[in-house]
Amino acid sequence: MMDLKQVFGDFNQHLLQDETPSRYFETMLRQGLFYKVYPFTMLGELVKTPQSVQHHPEGNVWNHTMMVVDRAAYHREESGNPGIFMWAALLHDLGKPDTTQTRKGKITSYDHDKLGEKLTVKFLTPLTEDKSFIEAVAKLVRWHMQTLFVVKDMPFADVHTMLQQVKLEEVALLSLCDRLGRGKMTVEKETSERENIKQFIQKSQAIANNGIR
């Protein structure tokens, strides 16, 4: 029987030490871990989950996740808690397989952030007894879409609740990696995404200070 906590330790080591953790996870994928052993099968589902070609030219959710993890590894020392940050990068789209739909030819995954919070808890609970760690990772997953919602003034924005549960800087850093971890990234696109992150921080701070949404 596989020692899940040992696998957790291996994952943790690669997430915190590798320059490109995706190489390790791609090896684990080829060896079948993500198709055979729960809860790792939750990651295997990402391979089968398509995304909008317009927003994700890199392809399925697994490809995107691997690109985000590598981006996160580049930025992890900027995080106040690299362990929580890197696990959130790995699990941030765990909710997409169950929320992805094709409507009128458009692929959507509404509320994958909310479901992702719950699935992150389910994923990590068999692997570690550190409940505060599990909760912290899950909350970062929960709020990783707020950059889009806040910058575009969407009704899903909820800055006050977000700031009660996570640090703004951590959400911004994860969002940056999420936005940059995509195919066909150009200098112009990267500059635009970084500007969006700055706007997110500024607008969130203004909302918090002014007592509005």
Model-predicted regions and their roles:
Residues 1, 212-213:
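C-terminal end-of-chain micro-motif
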Residues 55, 59, 107-110, 191:
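Charge-dense, low-complexity intrinsically disordered segments
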Residues 7, 11, 24-25, 37, ...:
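Generic structural signal of hydrophobic/aromatic residues within well-ordered alpha-helices
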Residues 1-103:
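Acidic/His-rich, divalent-metal-binding segments that scaffold phosphate/diphosphate chemistry
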Residues 166-171, 182-211:
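Acidic, carboxylate-rich catalytic segments that either coordinate divalent cations
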Residues 71-184:
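Divalent metal-dependent catalytic cores for phosphoryl transfer on phosphate-bearing substrates
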